[in-house]
UniProtKB/Swiss-Prot annotation:
One Pfam family hit: BPD_transp_1
Keyword Transmembrane: yes
GO biological process annotation, one example: transmembrane transport
Superkingdom to which the source organism belongs: Bacteria
Gene: ytlD
Organism lineage string: Bacteria, Bacillati, Bacillota, Bacilli, Bacillales
Name this protein carries in UniProt: Uncharacterized ABC transporter permease protein YtlD
Keywords: Cell membrane, Membrane, Transmembrane, Transmembrane helix, Transport
InterPro entries: MetI-like, MetI-like_sf
């Protein structure tokens, strides 16, 4: 019995070692790709293999970053865009989930709205930007609305599908004990669909950034989207690349935050 336990412990240690080794390899390759990309970009710019005026260089972007941080202008742009994106992200996810719950509650409503959801999902949401600006005015409200609307429909479709795919046996058991529909939704449907909702959050991170940046392209006088447009207008592509890199960093941080939420939720269920 003791030998059996020691064998299991040894196998578990070997498994953990392999997992750590694999994780280290993945991180090493990720770091190597990162270094190669920026090194290649810098060398190509210095050697004239690419036009430094158009493609800039990491060193030029870094110098501009320090300059913008020094005068304090960059933080205000980041703050505005981050506020709009997070709010649009939360609103889009919340409204999409609520609409999905409404469709689950009423099969008739789901059948009525189904073709319209398909059509709206096929439409390029970015094209709604000018309409939102006219309807809501050229303000941060229209930008937040853009960040929310771009993710509402896909959230509704994905979450509603997850609601529909919950095992009917669970709901039948609840009905047998006389549970009301809202109790079934709260105790069975919503918890069982949590993985799909969290997966939707991951998708919505990118969609919200797209919606907000496009909104800032159209109306804003502040924000990272405005910095990109201004950079194009004055032919300052270093400013454009700086803005894009900042967007990439914060989008990654938001995505990592959702992944952390997913891990905590998974750990809480086990």
């Amino acid at each position: 019995m003791r030998n059996s336990k020691e064998t299991i412990d040894l196998l578990h240690e070997q498994y953990q070692f392999k997992q750590k080794k694999e994780k280290w390899k993945v991180h090493s390759f990720q770091l190597a790709i990162f270094i190669l990309f920026f090194s290649g970009w810098e060398i190509s710019s210095r050697q004239g293999w690419i036009d430094p005026l158009i493609f800039s260089s990491p060193s030029a972007v870094w110098r501009l970053l320090l300059e913008k941080l020094g005068d304090g202008s960059l933080l205000s742009h980041i703050g505005v865009t981050l506020f709009e994106t997070v709010l649009g992200f939360l609103l889009g996810t919340f409204m999409g989930t609520c609409l999905a719950a409404l469709l689950w509650w009423s099969n008739r409503l789901a059948r009525i709205l189904d073709p319209y959801l398909v059509i709206l999902n096929a439409m390029p949401k970015v094209a709604l930007g000018p309409i939102l600006i006219v309807a809501l005015g050229p303000s941060f409200i229209s930008i937040i609305a853009m960040g929310a609307i771009i993710s509402v429909i896909i959230t509704t479709i994905v979450v509603y599908t997850a609601f529909q795919e919950v095992d009917e046996n669970y709901t039948k058991v609840m009905k047998t004990f006389g549970a009301k529909k809202w109790v079934i939704f709260k105790e069975v449907i919503l918890p069982a669909s949590s993985p799909a909702i969290i997966s939707t959050l991951k998708v919505n991170v990118g969609l919200s950034w797209v919606g907000v940046i496009v909104g800032e392209f159209l109306v804003s006088k502040v924000g990272l989207g405005y910095m990109i447009i201004y950079g194009f207008q004055v032919f300052n592509f270093t400013l454009v690349f700086l803005s894009l890199l900042i967007i990439a960093i914060f989008a990654t941080l938001m995505y990592q935050g959702v992944e952390l939420l997913e891990k905590k939720w998974t750990k809480g269920r086990t």
